[in-house]
């Protein structure tokens, strides 16, 4: 069996809407095997055991690109630690996992760049799939039907705290509340802060993240779909967070804190309990590897 491990991702980082994303050390593992015929699923709810399965669709996309007719396919979800519809890239783990698994079956026919192009074609934007495939913090754009990206050498000194609500928020639902157009003022607001944010991660001047992480494109609109958002967001800053932003389409709030801060998570847990919010807190770090093969036998 071919086993692929894919990291969670936090996209739409601050002002970097559809552009900035980071891979984190929380993983989904998928197993793949070519079989004599048919389509077999293991470890998944019955509703996903069909040809509409996003993992299968990504694999078929890759096989079709190669002109390969697969006899049969067995797909297993071995481990699912990335929560679904929480803004941590669960769908991207499926897309990237399927593409990487298919490429292994094909004998690594496609390059990493070609797999990224396929992932963006499927997903529609690069900010989740790029770090899921490549690891690290990635700045990516889509221009004239091609993806261009670069990885940021993130300086040490920080850790990421995922503050995960106990309810789902679909990307489709979160997209509906966004405005069709933005003002020049908001455009300048985000562009300037996105530039500063990249500089902060590159230089390690994390004291500036608080100002760089602000957004005018999506957070104000989507936060209204998340009961308790404002309270938790403001409390995170009060407790010493260097930066806070809505992860992906939400509902997870991502706090960036000093790596030496030992009190933030416990203090925030106390606050959530007082407020009656049954949210989960996960301390995470940067994953630089991206999607990896942890077992490679067909």
Swiss-Prot record:
This is Homoserine kinase. It catalyses: L-homoserine + ATP = O-phospho-L-homoserine + ADP + H(+). Catalyzes the ATP-dependent phosphorylation of L-homoserine to L-homoserine phosphate. SUPFAM superfamilies: GHMP Kinase, C-terminal domain, Ribosomal protein S5 domain 2-like. Keywords: Amino-acid biosynthesis, ATP-binding, Cytoplasm, Kinase, Nucleotide-binding, Threonine biosynthesis, Transferase. ATP binds at residues 83-93. It comes from Clostridium beijerinckii (strain ATCC 51743 / NCIMB 8052) (Clostridium acetobutylicum). The keyword Transferase applies. Coiled coil: none annotated. One of its GO terms (molecular function) is ATP binding. Its EC number is 2.7.1.39. It is found in: Cytoplasm. One of its GO terms (biological process) is threonine biosynthetic process. Pfam families: GHMP_kinases_C (PF08544), GHMP_kinases_N (PF00288). Pathway: Amino-acid biosynthesis; L-threonine biosynthesis; L-threonine from L-aspartate: step 4/5. PANTHER family: HOMOSERINE KINASE, HOMOSERINE/4-DIPHOSPHOCYTIDYL-2-C-METHYL-D-ERYTHRITOL KINASE. The keyword Nucleotide-binding applies. It is an enzyme of class 2 (transferase). It comes from the Bacteria. One of its GO terms (cellular component) is cytoplasm. Belongs to the GHMP kinase family. Homoserine kinase subfamily. Gene3D superfamilies: 3.30.230.10, GHMP kinase, C-terminal domain. Signal peptide: none annotated.
């Amino acid at each position: 069996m071919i086993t692929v491990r894919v990291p969670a991702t936090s996209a739409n980082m601050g002002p970097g809407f559809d552009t900035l994303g980071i891979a984190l050390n929380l993983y989904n593992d998928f197993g793949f095997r070519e079989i004599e015929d048919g389509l077999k699923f293991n470890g998944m709810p019955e509703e996903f055991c069909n040809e509409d399965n996003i993992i299968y669709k990504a694999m078929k996309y890759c096989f079709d690109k190669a002109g390969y007719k697969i006899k049969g396919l067995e797909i297993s979800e071995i481990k699912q630690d990335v929560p679904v519809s929480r803004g941590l890239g669960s769908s991207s783990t499926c897309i990237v996992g399927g593409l990487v698994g298919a490429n292994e079956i094909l004998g690594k026919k496609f390059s990493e760049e070609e797999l990224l192009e396929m992932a963006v074609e499927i997903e529609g934007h690069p900010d989740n799939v790029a770090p899921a495939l490549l690891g690290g913090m990635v700045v990516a754009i889509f221009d004239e039907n091609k993806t261009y990206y670069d990885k940021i050498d993130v300086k040490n000194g920080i850790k990421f705290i995922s503050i995960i609500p106990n309810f789902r928020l679909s990307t489709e639902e979160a997209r509906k509340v966004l405005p069709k157009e933005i003002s020049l003022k908001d455009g300048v607001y985000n562009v300037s802060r996105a530039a500063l944010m990249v500089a902060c991660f590159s230089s390690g001047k994390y004291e500036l993240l608080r100002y760089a992480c602000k957004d005018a494109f999506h957070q104000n609109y989507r936060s209204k779909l998340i009961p308790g958002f404002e309270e938790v967001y403001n409390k995170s800053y009060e407790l010493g967070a260097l930066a806070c932003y809505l992860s992906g389409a939400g509902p997870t709030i991502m706090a960036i804190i000093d790596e030496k801060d030992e009190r933030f998570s416990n203090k925030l847990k106390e606050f959530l309990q007082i407020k009656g919010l049954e949210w989960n807190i996960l301390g995470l770090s940067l994953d630089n590897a991206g999607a990896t093969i942890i077992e490679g036998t067909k």
